[in-house]
């Protein structure tokens, strides 16, 4: 034990500088709190230890929402992008999701600079070994492995996969963080001393291979969308450029046979790994064993950066022995001569049950202690980043004596994620999906600014310039919707030829432009030649106007559902409500309600094991008080 010494005084300490820690530290500092962020390695700030991309299905929604609130991730992705693709364009706008392939090293450098240049924020390379409290259970300081004692009033835990991290490659294992970095070996003991129960989760990553050893002619080339789409509402898409392609390939029966013959050497199947793995991101050995009927599995070969030949095998994560990895990779067309640069591995780490948190991500049992990211049981950079933002903002607001920052299920995917975590918990690493939201037509990525930028502006995290641009676009959208409702388009041979070409009924008399636009086959852009009086408005405003007119009926139905949900959310439950002393509640409901302690009737109704009858009783009991 090193001799402790006073090292400094801050309002908030953020432990970990991955995607959660970055957003937490930036938000807290921008709100005026003296903040310090600790990382085991400065070279790991904003590291992408798994796929070198930001966004994807549902994750793109989170990135846009974070940007609308004043977060940094979307700007960093735009500044370092190699390729931009909008996913799920064959489906409705509710599930359209942006994914940006990024330059891993440049992303790290962008985020490192963002932290270094942020007023009110100090950046420190050190391992935190304890969180210290006084006799009243109040946080007083954090202590480093070298004895530095930093006086703080609040702590945000954003430890990623570092807490007692342990990697596995076949029979080989060692205590390690991701990418061979030093793990956080001692902090877990300090958390247990605070009464926090920890559990083990695991995740994995594929090998990185040398691009010069790949036969790209045997793989399908995948280019970015033209023109590229920006992740941030503040980025001018005209400044973006697709730089590198990705590639698509497939495993085959030979690949699967090599894996099956060596499955006994897998630490997952051999029982060496105790942690629970991600359900929606299985390893290739998991895919082969669980989906034996499938003759092949798709993977993506993705560049790690502009100035490296290192490439990422998305969809082929593994913890099989190194020589087995080489053998099965080389059965794949295009990878017959492939050379591994980094070995695939699984990593096991400590995390918590997030039902121990409030919806501000503060621990119920330890005031001013917050959790964010994989520490809370989630997977994914984007899920981590939004939790970091929520924790950072709420830690700052609480210290300043201000009301908390809350966003609910009807307002955002961020609210859905937080509510799922603190209400339902997770038995395996939680991943955001559009299917997790009841209101996904309202929670589109294209309207994240309309939903959340007012909150970001009210917090002081959106600049006046961005706010005025937003207001202008919203005004343009509303004016264009009104114009389209009034403007009539007369039938012409050219218009009817277009309508027939897309499988829509030709016109026999004039119709309002909005009615024509409500036809599923007809787009706003395609109507431009038949709408000569159309004003020049921002493309984002035009997109919003089109979607809101085309799906007006569905949107009104979901808005009615939201009003009913809000009625329940606005019925608060006192924090000290004694469920066990109430008559009429079932024992299972009492146990669940006592443990999770929901903040409202709405949250209580979403707890597994609490029935509609229990909710009815609870409403009556609360009204009697």
Task: Enumerate the predicted regions with their spans.
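Conserved beta-strand-loop-beta-strand element in the redox core of flavoprotein oxidoreductases
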Residues: 132-148
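Extended, charge-enriched "interface" segments that sit outside catalytic cores
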Residues: 436, 442-444, 453-458, 462-614, ...
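A glycine-rich dinucleotide-binding beta-alpha-beta segment and adjacent secondary-structure elements
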Residues: 312-378, 406-419, 538-592, 597
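An anion/pyrophosphate-binding glycine-rich loop and adjacent beta-alpha core
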Residues: 41-43, 59, 86, 188-326, ...
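Beta1/beta-strand and adjacent pyrophosphate-binding region of the FAD-binding site
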Residues: 6-20
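Internal hydrophobic alpha-helix adjacent to the cofactor/substrate pocket in enzyme cavities
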Residues: 384-405
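Conserved N-terminal/central alpha/beta ligand/cofactor-binding core
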Residues: 8-9, 26-130, 146, 158-175, ...
């Amino acid at each position: 034990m090193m001799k402790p010494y006073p090292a400094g005084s801050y309002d908030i300490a953020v432990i970990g500088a991955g995607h959660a820690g970055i957003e937490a530290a930036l938000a807290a500092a921008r709100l005026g709190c003296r903040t310090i962020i600790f990382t085991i390695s400065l070279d790991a700030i904003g590291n992408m230890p798994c796929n070198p991309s930001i966004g994807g299905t549902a994750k793109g929604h989170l990135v846009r929402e974070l940007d609308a609130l004043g977060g940094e991730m979307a700007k960093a992705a735009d500044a370092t992008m190699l390729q931009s693709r909008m996913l799920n364009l064959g489906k409705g706008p509710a599930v359209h999701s942006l994914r940006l392939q990024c330059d891993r090293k440049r992303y790290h450098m962008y985020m490192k600079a963002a932290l270094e240049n942020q007023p009110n924020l100090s950046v420190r390379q050190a391992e935190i070994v304890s969180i210290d409290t006084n006799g009243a259970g109040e946080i007083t300081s954090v202590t480093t492995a070298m004895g530095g004692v930093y006086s703080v009033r609040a702590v945000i835990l954003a430890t990623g996969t570092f807490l007692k991290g342990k990697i596995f490659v076949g029979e080989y294992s060692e205590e390690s963080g991701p990418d061979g970095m030093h793990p956080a070996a001692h902090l877990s003991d300090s958390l247990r001393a605070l009464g926090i129960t920890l559990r083990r989760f695991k995740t994995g990553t594929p090998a990185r291979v040398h691009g010069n050893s790949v036969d790209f002619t045997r793989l399908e080339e995948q280019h970015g969308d033209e023109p590229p789409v920006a992740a941030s509402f503040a980025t001018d898409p005209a400044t973006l450029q697709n730089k590198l392609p990705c590639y698509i390939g497939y495993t085959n029966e030979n690949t699967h046979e090599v894996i099956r013959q060596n499955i006994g050497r897998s630490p997952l199947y051999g029982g060496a790994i105790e942690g629970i793995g991600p359900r929606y991101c299985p390893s290739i050995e998991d895919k082969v064993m669980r989906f034996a009927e499938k003759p092949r599995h798709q993977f993506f070969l993705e560049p790690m950066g502009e100035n490296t030949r290192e490439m990422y095998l998305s969809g082929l994560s593994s913890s099989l022995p190194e020589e087995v990895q080489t053998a099965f990779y080389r059965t794949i067309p295009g990878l017959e001569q492939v050379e591994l640069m980094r070995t695939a591995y699984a990593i096991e780490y400590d995390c918590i049950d997030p039902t121990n948190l409030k919806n501000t991500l503060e621990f119920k049992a330890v005031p001013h202690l917050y959790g964010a990211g994989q520490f809370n049981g989630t997977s994914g950079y984007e899920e981590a980043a939004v939790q970091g933002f929520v924790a950072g903002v709420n830690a700052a607001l609480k210290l300043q004596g201000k009301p908390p920052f809350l966003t609910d299920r009807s307002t955002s995917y961020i609210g859905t994620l937080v509510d799922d975590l603190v209400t339902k918990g997770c038995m395996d690493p939680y991943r955001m999906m559009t299917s997790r939201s009841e209101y996904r037509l309202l929670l589109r990525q294209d309207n994240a600014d309309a939903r959340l930028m007012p909150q970001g502006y009210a917090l002081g995290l959106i600049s006046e310039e961005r706010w005025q641009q937003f207001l202008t676009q919203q005004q343009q959208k509303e004016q264009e919707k009104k114009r389209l409702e009034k403007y009539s388009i007369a039938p012409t041979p050219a218009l009817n030829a277009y309508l027939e070409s897309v499988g829509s009924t030709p016109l026999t008399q004039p119709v309002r432009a909005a009615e024509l636009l409500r036809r599923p086959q007809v787009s706003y852009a395609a109507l431009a030649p038949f709408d000569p009086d159309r004003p020049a408005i921002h493309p984002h405003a035009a997109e919003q106007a089109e979607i809101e007119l085309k799906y007006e009926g569905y949107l009104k139905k979901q808005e009615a559902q939201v009003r009913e949900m809000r009625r329940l959310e606005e019925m608060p439950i006192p924090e000290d409500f004694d469920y066990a002393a109430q008559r009429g509640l079932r024992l299972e409901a009492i146990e669940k309600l006592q443990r999770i302690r929901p903040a409202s009737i709405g949250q209580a109704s979403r707890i597994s094991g609490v029935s509609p009858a229990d909710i009815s009783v609870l409403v009556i009991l609360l009204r009697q008080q």
